[in-house]
Amino acid sequence: EAAGLLPFPRV
């Protein structure tokens, strides 16, 4: 989803 935007990718 917001991988790269947030410091932790949603899995």
Swiss-Prot record:
In-chain residues carrying the UniProt-annotated modification Valine amide: 11
Cellular localization per UniProt: Secreted
Biological process annotations from GO: neuropeptide signaling pathway
Superkingdom of the source species: Eukaryota
N-terminal signal peptide: none
GO cellular component, one term: extracellular region
Coiled coil: none
UniProt keyword terms in alphabetical order: Amidation, Neuropeptide, Secreted
Principal location: secreted
Stated role: Mediates visceral muscle contractile activity (myotropic activity).
Family statement drawn from the similarity comment of this UniProt entry: Belongs to the periviscerokinin family.
Name used for this protein in its record: CAPA-Periviscerokinin-1
Organism this protein belongs to: Karoophasma biedouwense
